Curated annotation (Swiss-Prot):
Cited SUPFAM superfamilies: ARM repeat, RNI-like
Coiled coil: none
Function, as annotated: Probably acts as a target recruitment subunit in an E3 ubiquitin ligase complex ZYGA-CUL2-elongin BC.
Keywords, alphabetical: Leucine-rich repeat, Repeat, Ubl conjugation pathway
Annotated signal peptide: none
Cellular-component GO terms for this entry: Cul2-RING ubiquitin ligase complex
LRR repeats: 204-227, 235-260, 490-513
Full protein name: Protein zyg-11 homolog A
Length: 759
C-alpha cells in the first residue's frame, strides 16, 4: 500500500520556444519528441542481438550470415551507431570484414579496437573518409596510417582523415602521410605531430584543410609549400611554436587562398598573436572565418575594423576575450559570433567548441550567469550542455558547471517544456558524472537538486535503482536541513518506482531506514510536524510497501516504538494516515505481523478505527483485517480478536460507498496480499474489508486495477464469492459491483480465457 502525494513547485510564467525567435529550439523539441526512425530502431535491435544473429569464426570474432547485404548508407550508419553505443570491439568489428557491407565513410571515434582488428575490418574497403579521433591507445596513429597505406586505392582516394590521439610511441618521429596523395582534409589535433611531419604533409598535392592544433610543431614555414591550395588552417593552442610574431604573420600573409583561420588559444597563456594580426591591413583578403578566442588585448574596435575591411566574413570567434559586446556584432547581417556576451554567442560557442574543453568550460560559465533567472525554455541550449557533458566526461569543471547550467535550464517549471528524451539524456549524464567524481560534494548537490524536479522524477526515464542508492547515501551524510528535506522527498518518490526486489537489493536500505527513523524521532521529540517530518513518514511508508526487508529493518530499529510515540504526540489525520499506512505494510508480512499484536499498538489502531477521517479509519481497518485473519496470532486473545472483528464490521457498515473520495491517494502494487482475505469465508468482516478496498481502487483507476485483476488471477476469487453459499449478501454485492465495472471496462476486449464467467 502506498501514498503518493508530491507537492510541485509553483511554476513561473514559462514561455515556450518561439518558432521565429528560436527556430533551433523548436527544431530540437520536434526532433527529440519524434519517434526514432525505423532504420535506427532496426539497427538498435540488430546490434543488441549480434551474438544471436552472427556465427563465430575460429579466432572468436563474429561473422554476419553470408547471404546478408547492406546498402552502403545503412552499413555506414550501422557502424556509427555501434561506435556511439560503445559496441565496436575486436570481436564485433570483424563483421565488416566480409562482403555483406561496403564502406566509404567510416567513423570509429572513441572506439576501443586493436591495430589488427582495424586493418582487417576497414582497410580493405574503398574509404574516402575516416574519423579516428580519440580512439583507444591500442590503435596508435602510426598504425592507422600504415594500415591505410596498405590499400593502394585508399592511398590515392582517401580525402578526409581526422585523428586525435596522444598514443604514439615516444621514439616515433615521422608520420608518413605522403603516401596518402588524395588527402584534402587532415586533422592531427592533439597528436604527437612534429615540424618534420608538417613539412611532409604540406607537400600533399590536394591538401586544402589542415588542423595542427595542440601539436609539437615549432615552425609553420612549411605551409608556404601549399600556400596556393590551403583554404583552411586551424592551429589552436600551438604551444610549442618558437617563431616570432612577425615570422608567423609573414607566413599567414602568404596564404592568399585561406578562407578559414583559427589561431585561438587558452586564455591563461595571454597570447597576443591575434592582437597583432588584427592590426594588419594586407593580410587574409579572402577570409570568411576567423577564430581568435582566448586572445589577449582584443577590443571591439579592432575586430570591427578588421571585419569592415573584409565584408565577406561570416564568423568570428571571440570567446574568452574582451570583445563581443558591441552592437556591431548583433546588427551585422550574416555574421555569427562565438563569444560570451549574449545567449546567441554562447550557443554558437558551445556548438563550435564542443570538443575543446577549455572553451566549453568558459562558455558554460557564461551560460550559468545568463540563465540564472531564465524564464524561457531553451531546449537547444540544454542539448548543447548535454553534448559538452558527454564529450568531456572526466573534466570536473565541465561536469560541475554543466550540472549547474542544467539546473538553471530545467528548474521551476522549465522542465515541462523540455522533451522527455533530452531530459533523460541529461539526467543519465549527471549520474555518470557522479560515478566519475564520487567525492565532489557540490556536483552531488546539483544532481540531488535536479531530482527534486517533479517532471524529471516522475516522467523521465533513468536508472531509478542507481538514483535511490545515491540519494540514500546522501541522506545518511547528515547534511544541512534543506538538503536533508530534499533527499527525504526524493527518497519518498523513488521508493514508489522501485520493485520490491530492487528495494531488497539496496545495500543502503538498512542505513536509510535507520536515518529516516532518527529524523522521525527527533521531530517527534521536538513536537515539530514540518515538511521534512511529513516527507520522512511518507518515505518510510513507501519504502516498506511490498518490501519485507524494509519492514524488518523498521522493526529492528525500534520503528514501532517511535511510531507509537508519533501517534501519542500528533493528532493530525495527515500524520495518522501515514503511520497507519506503514503499519499496514508490516501487517501484510506474515513473519512480522505478530510484532503488531501488542496492547500499545492495538489500543491506538482500535481508537483510530472510529476516526471521522475516512482514510485514517480505512488504514486502521486494513491493519485489523490482516492481523485478525491469522488465528495463530490470537491463541490467547480470542475474545479480543472477536471484539476487533465486531468493531471492524460496524465501522465498514458506516462507511460511504466504495467509490467515495479520500484525501490520501491509495494505491497498490499488487492484490496478492488481499487474496487470503478474499478466501476467508469464516471471517466475513475481513473479507468485506478486502472487497471494499479493491472496489475503491478499481473505481478510481480501472485501467490499472482491472488489468491487475487479470494478470494476478483475482477474477476467479471474485466469481467464487458471488457463488459461495457462506458469503454474506454485502460481500456478494461488492464482488458483483467489481465484476460489473470490470465488464464495462473491458467490454470491447472480451476474452473468455480471462475468467470463466458470463460476459
Amino acid at each position: 500500500m502506498v501514498h503518493f502525494l508530491h507537492p510541485g513547485h509553483t511554476p513561473r510564467n514559462i514561455v515556450p520556444p518561439d518558432a521565429q525567435k528560436d527556430a533551433l529550439g523548436c527544431c530540437v523539441v520536434q526532433e527529440e519528441a519524434s519517434p526514432y526512425t525505423l532504420v535506427n530502431i532496426c539497427l538498435n535491435v540488430l546490434i543488441a542481438n549480434l551474438e544471436k544473429l552472427c556465427s563465430e569464426r575460429p579466432d572468436g570474432t563474429l561473422c554476419l550470415p553470408e547471404h546478408w547485404s547492406f546498402p552502403q548508407e545503412v552499413a555506414e550508419r550501422f557502424l556509427r551507431v555501434m561506435t556511439w553505443q560503445g559496441k565496436l570491439t575486436d570481436r564485433t568489428a570483424s563483421i565488416f570484414r566480409g562482403n555483406q557491407m561496403k564502406l566509404k565513410l567510416v567513423n570509429i571515434q572513441k572506439a576501443k579496437i586493436s591495430t589488427a582488428a582495424f586493418i582487417k575490418a576497414f582497410c580493405r574497403h574503398k574509404l574516402i573518409e575516416l574519423n579516428a579521433t580519440a580512439v583507444h591507445a591500442d590503435l596508435p596513429v602510426p598504425d592507422i596510417i600504415s594500415g591505410l597505406c596498405s590499400n593502394r586505392w585508399i592511398q590515392q582516394n582517401l580525402q578526409c582523415l581526422l585523428l586525435d590521439s596522444t598514443s604514439i610511441p615516444q621514439n616515433s618521429r615521422l608520420l608518413f602521410f605522403s603516401q596518402l596523395t588524395g588527402l584534402r582534409i587532415l586533422s592531427v589535433f592533439n597528436v604527437c605531430f612534429h615540424t618534420e611531419d608538417l613539412a611532409n604533409v604540406s607537400q600533399l598535392p590536394r591538401l586544402e584543410s589542415l588542423d595542427i592544433s595542440n601539436t609539437l610543431v615549432t615552425d609553420i614555414s612549411a605551409l608556404l609549400t601549399c600556400k596556393d591550395r590551403l583554404k583552411s588552417l586551424t592551429m589552436h593552442y600551438l604551444k610549442c611554436l618558437a617563431m616570432t610574431k612577425s615570422q608567423i604573420l609573414a607566413v599567414i600573409r602568404e596564404l592568399k587562398c585561406l578562407l578559414h583561420l583559427d589561431i585561438s588559444d587558452h586564455r591563461q597563456l595571454k597570447s597576443d598573436l591575434a592582437f597583432h594580426l588584427l592590426q594588419q591591413k594586407d593580410i587574409l583578403p579572402n577570409v570568411v572565418s576567423l577564430d581568435i578566442s582566448g586572445g589577449n588585448c582584443i577590443t571591439d574596435e579592432a575586430v570591427e575594423l578588421f571585419i569592415r575591411l573584409r565584408p565577406a566574413m561570416q564568423f568570428v570567434g571571440l570567446l574568452a576575450t574582451d570583445a563581443g559586446s558591441s552592437d556591431f556584432f548583433t546588427t551585422k547581417q550574416g555574421l555569427r559570433v562565438a563569444g560570451g556576451a549574449s545567449m546567441s554567442q554562447i550557443s554558437e560557442a558551445l556548438s563550435r567548441y564542443r570538443n575543446r574543453s577549455c572553451f566549453v568550460k568558459e562558455a558554460l560559465h557564461r551560460l550559468f550567469t545568463e540563465t540564472f533567472s531564465m524564464e524561457v525554455t531553451m531546449p537547444a541550449i540544454l542539448k548543447l550542455v548535454a553534448i559538452g557533458m558527454r564529450n568531456h566526461p572526466l573534466d570536473l569543471r565541465v561536469q560541475f558547471t554543466a550540472s549547474a547550467c542544467a539546473l538553471n535550464l530545467t528548474r521551476q517549471g522549465l522542465a515541462k517544456g523540455m522533451p522527455v528524451r533530452l531530459l533523460s539524456e541529461v539526467t543519465c549524464l549527471l549520474f555518470k558524472a557522479l560515478k566519475n567524481f564520487p567525492h565532489y560534494q557540490q556536483l552531488q548537490k546539483n544532481c540531488l537538486l535536479s531530482l527534486t524536479n517533479s517532471r524529471i522524477l516522475v516522467d523521465v526515464p533513468f536508472d531509478r535503482f542507481d538514483a535511490a542508492k545515491f540519494v540514500m547515501r546522501w541522506l545518511c551524510k547528515h547534511e544541512n536541513p534543506k538538503m536533508q528535506t530534499m533527499a527525504v522527498s526524493v527518497t519518498s518518490i523513488l521508493a514508489l518506482q522501485l520493485s520490491p526486489e530492487q528495494t531488497a537489493q539496496l545495500e543502503e536500505l538498512f542505513m536509510a531506514v535507520k536515518e529516516l527513523l532518527a529524523i522521525v524521532k527527533q521531530k517527534t521529540t521536538e513536537n515539530l510536524d514540518d515538511v521534512t517530518f511529513l516527507f520522512t513518514l511518507k518515505a518510510l511508508w513507501n519504502l516498506t510497501d511490498g518490501s519485507p526487508a524494509a519492514c524488518k529493518h523498521f522493526i529492528e530499529n525500534q520503528g514501532l516504538q517511535i511510531f507509537i510515540q508519533v501517534l501519542e504526540t500528533f493528532s493530525e489525520s495527515a500524520i495518522q494516515s501515514k503511520v497507519l499506512g506503514l503499519l499496514n505494510n508490516i501487517a501484510e508480512v506474515r513473519e512480522l505481523s505478530s510484532k503488531l499484536v501488542t496492547e500499545d499498538v492495538l489500543k491506538h489502531i482500535n481508537s483510530l478505527l472510529c476516526s471521522r477521517e475516512m482514510e485514517v479509519s480505512y488504514f486502521a481497518a486494513g491493519i485489523i483485517a490482516h492481523l485478525t485473519s491469522d488465528r495463530q496470532l490470537w491463541i490467547s486473545r480470542d475474545f479480543q480478536r472477536r471484539t476487533l472483528l465486531q468493531d471492524l464490521h460496524a465501522t465498514i457498515q458506516n462507511w460511504p460507498s466504495s467509490s467515495c473520495k479520500m484525501t490520501a491517494l491509495v494505491t497498490y502494487r499488487s492484490f496478492k496480499t488481499f487474496f487470503p482475505l478474499l478466501g476467508n469465508f469464516s471471517q466475513p468482516e475481513v473479507q468485506l474489508w478486502a472487497l471494499w478496498a479493491m472496489y475503491h481502487v478499481c473505481s478510481k483507476n480501472p485501467s490499472k486495477y482491472c488489468k491487475m485483476l487479470v494478470e494476478e488471477e483475482g477474477l476467479q476469487l471474485l466469481c467464487d464469492i458471488q457463488e459461495h453459499s457462506e458469503a454474506t449478501p454485502k460481500a456478494q454485492q461488492i464482488a458483483a459491483s467489481i465484476l460489473d465495472d470490470f465488464r464495462m471496462h473491458f467490454m470491447n476486449y472480451q476474452r473468455p480465457t480471462l475468467c470463466q464467467m458470463p460476459f
